[in-house]
């Protein structure tokens, strides 16, 4: 992978040198941060931290570079990541490093309104913050953690934009990008996507089919009702490649089902922007793949004797119904940014409080912090593994 980084960088440099009409730019961010987590000592899913091996302390250094070279018809872009981390728990300390391209793309303007592209692209869409039901690749879209880096899908795309109101894309998925597992449900899949937008509204439709995976269907939209109020929503219909069945009847065992029954997941949200440019978002999520309250209770009861399968095959969300609130400052403020988040599992009544903030120390340097405080016991989703965590860091803008 390090060779791939050097090769791509050489291609950008060579192209820029050979073509005098090419424009090249680059920027980046250097991160350094430490994280401390207090693990739950009475965890049912991870007794003694022997299964998940979660770090109690970690130190991370990360470099993120954005490279671009473009002419009138061709654009080359890459996002290169280099990381070093030291992770420690009560039993051991581990060090690791990695370098990879989280995104890269070669984009060609074929004719007016038509573009062809290939590379590793983050296929992200939809306005949801807690989760993104309309997206088969990034259900957890990373918006709850501003430090998270999404990795793109290896793909080739042809897109048509006949006017400012409409666009359509056809994408072939080769694999799920960096660190792809052999069990990749969307390998060799085809994605069709259509978008339509007006002055106050936007709508998108998505369909995806892979050879060995039932089709995924998604939709998302938003409507601006006033200068202050935005309504939005997302919808997805899918199966899960592997589903851990947890019957409410505790006398029945866990079963693992391949290609679970088709279920619908939906998110409804509203965002209100105040006169001081702060905003409040409220979201409700229903995940048809999650457990009912009785099924989740049986899940934790079975996990007492089978923690390995309970943790290893756990669904993406344990519950079916969630409430998520976000109160944040003005995103365009030059001096800093803060965000407060509250999530509640409406089935097991567990909560999670989180806060993120960053402040500008100089034109190039910012300090940031992320605190997460689950509220509940060992039989509730948010508090099943960790009692609390705190991350403190610095980031330096390059060049």
Stretch-by-stretch model annotation:
Residues 53-61, 97-102, 150-154, 186-190, ...:
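Residues that define the transmembrane beta-barrel architecture of outer-membrane proteins
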Residues 97, 218, 230-334, 340-342, ...:
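Extracellular/periplasmic loop regions
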Residues 20, 24, 65-71, 108-109, ...:
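Residue-level signature of outer-membrane beta-barrel architecture
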Residues 18-116, 357, 370, 385, ...:
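Beta-barrel outer-membrane channel/assembly domains of diderm bacteria
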Residues 323-327, 359, 373, 384-399:
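Outer-membrane beta-barrel "beta-signal"
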Residues 28-36, 78-84, 118-120, 170-174, ...:
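Transmembrane beta-barrel strands of outer-membrane/channel proteins
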Residues 67-168, 173, 376:
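Outer membrane beta-barrel
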Residues 72-77, 113-116, 165-168, 198-205, ...:
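Repeated loop/turn-to-beta-strand initiation elements of outer-membrane beta-barrel proteins
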């Amino acid at each position: 992978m390090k060779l791939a980084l050097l090769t791509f960088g050489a291609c950008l440099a060579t192209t820029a040198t050979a073509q005098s009409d090419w424009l090249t730019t680059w920027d980046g961010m250097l991160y350094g941060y430490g994280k401390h987590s207090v693990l739950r000592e009475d965890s049912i899913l991870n007794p003694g931290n022997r299964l998940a091996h979660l770090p109690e302390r970690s130190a991370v250094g990360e470099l993120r570079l954005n490279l671009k070279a473009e002419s009138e018809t061709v654009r080359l872009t890459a996002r290169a990541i280099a990381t070093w981390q030291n992770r420690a728990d009560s039993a051991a300390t581990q060090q690791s490093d990695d370098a990879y391209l989280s995104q890269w793309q070669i984009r060609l303007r074929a004719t007016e309104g038509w573009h062809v592209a290939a590379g590793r692209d983050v296929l992200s869409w939809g306005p949801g913050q807690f989760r993104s039901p309309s997206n088969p690749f990034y259900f957890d879209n990373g918006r709850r953690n501003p430090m998270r880096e999404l990795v793109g899908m290896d793909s080739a795309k042809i897109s048509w934009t006949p006017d400012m109101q409409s666009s359509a894309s056809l994408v072939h998925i080769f694999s799920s990008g960096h660190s792809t597992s052999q069990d990749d449900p969307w390998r060799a899949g085809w994605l069709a996507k259509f978008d339509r937008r007006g002055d106050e509204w936007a709508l998108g439709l998505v369909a995806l089919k892979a050879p060995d995976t039932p089709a995924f269907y998604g939709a998302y939209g938003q409507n601006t009702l006033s200068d202050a109020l935005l309504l939005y929503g997302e919808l997805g219909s899918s199966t899960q490649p592997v589903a851990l069945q947890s019957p409410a009847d505790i006398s029945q065992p866990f079963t693992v089902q391949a290609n679970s029954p088709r279920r619908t997941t939906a998110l409804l949200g509203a965002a209100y922007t105040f006169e001081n440019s702060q905003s409040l978002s409220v979201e409700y999520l229903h995940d048809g793949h999650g457990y009912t309250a009785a099924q989740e209770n049986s899940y934790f009861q079975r996990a007492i004797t089978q923690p390995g399968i309970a943790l290893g095959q756990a669904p993406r969300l344990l519950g079916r119904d969630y409430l998520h609130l976000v109160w944040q400052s003005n995103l365009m403020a030059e001096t800093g940014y803060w965000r407060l988040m509250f999530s509640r599992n409406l089935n097991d009544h567990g909560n999670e409080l989180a806060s993120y903030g960053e402040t500008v120390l100089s034109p190039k340097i910012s300090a940031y912090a992320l605190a997460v405080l689950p509220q509940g016991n060992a039989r509730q989703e948010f508090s099943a593994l960790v009692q609390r965590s705190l991350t403190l860091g610095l980031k330096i803008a390059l060049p």
